[in-house]
């Protein structure tokens, strides 16, 4: 039976394969009447939220008196007298005086600080002023035992240094005297005829050895094979 029902086809033409119609949702603006109705409903809700009606029952008046009245005021004494006369059966409730900020800080410092710092702070706070911003002074930690680990420092022996100084001073004196004599010999040739300088003789010997070595040096490189006519240095 289902095959005989007419199908709901959204094609543009009654032909198979024809394009379908495009389905879209159009926005419609609400009417002015609906807008007014919604505005009235919203106004009523706002009134109920921000200005609620008083609930049915006895009204309770909360009279909260300050806990810290000024010193020497008449209101504070009247409250104490009235509470004592009216409440015969119930004990009177006395308002608690709040502690000042300086007193609280002083109490905290006295609890946390040591006995020595507490005694000093109590002696300084006799006048009523509390310097609760300054932290307590810290003592340096005591050093137990030898800080060097039980090892003694070796004693310094200054005798070798003194000897070295004496040797160096003697050397300086000898070198200065030698140089002075050498200068004097240069200036006065008559004095230095029999005394020759040992450094000059050593330099002359080195020059003679260099000349002998140059005489025995090969003038050119020797041939690879043979070469009887080559002037060998040992011939």
UniProtKB/Swiss-Prot annotation:
Ranges of biased composition (kind: Low complexity): 112-124
Highest taxon listed in the record's lineage: Viruses
Record's compositionally biased regions (Basic and acidic residues): 152-170
Biased composition range(s): Acidic residues: 72-89
Region Disordered: start-end pairs: 37-235
Feature: compositional bias, Polar residues: 185-202
Family: Belongs to the herpesviridae BKRF4 family.
Protein's name according to its UniProt entry: Uncharacterized gene 45 protein
Lineage: Viruses, Duplodnaviria, Heunggongvirae, Peploviricota, Herviviricetes
């Amino acid at each position: 039976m289902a095959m005989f029902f007419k199908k709901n086809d959204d094609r543009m033409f009654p032909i198979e394969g024809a394009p379908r119609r495009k389905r879209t949702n159009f926005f419609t603006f609400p009417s002015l009447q609906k807008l007014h109705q919604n505005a009235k409903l919203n106004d009523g809700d706002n009134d109920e939220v921000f200005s609620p009606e008083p609930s049915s029952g006895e009204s309770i008046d909360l009279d909260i008196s300050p806990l810290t009245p000024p010193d020497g005021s008449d209101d504070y004494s009247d409250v104490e007298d009235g509470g004592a006369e009216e409440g015969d059966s119930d004990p009177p409730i006395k308002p608690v005086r709040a502690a000042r900020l300086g007193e609280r800080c002083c109490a905290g410092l006295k609890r946390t600080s040591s006995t020595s710092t507490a005694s000093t702070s109590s002696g300084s706070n006799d006048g009523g002023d509390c310097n609760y911003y300054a932290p307590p002074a810290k003592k340096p930690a005591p050093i137990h035992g030898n800080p060097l680990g039980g090892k003694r420092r070796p004693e310094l022996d200054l005798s070798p240094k003194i000897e070295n100084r004496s040797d160096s001073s003697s050397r300086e004196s000898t070198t200065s005297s030698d140089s002075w004599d050498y200068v004097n010999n240069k200036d006065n040739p008559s004095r230095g005829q029999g005394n020759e300088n040992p450094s000059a003789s050593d330099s002359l010997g080195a020059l003679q050895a260099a000349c002998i070595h140059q005489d025995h040096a090969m003038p050119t490189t020797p041939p690879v094979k043979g070469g009887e006519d080559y002037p060998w240095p040992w011939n």
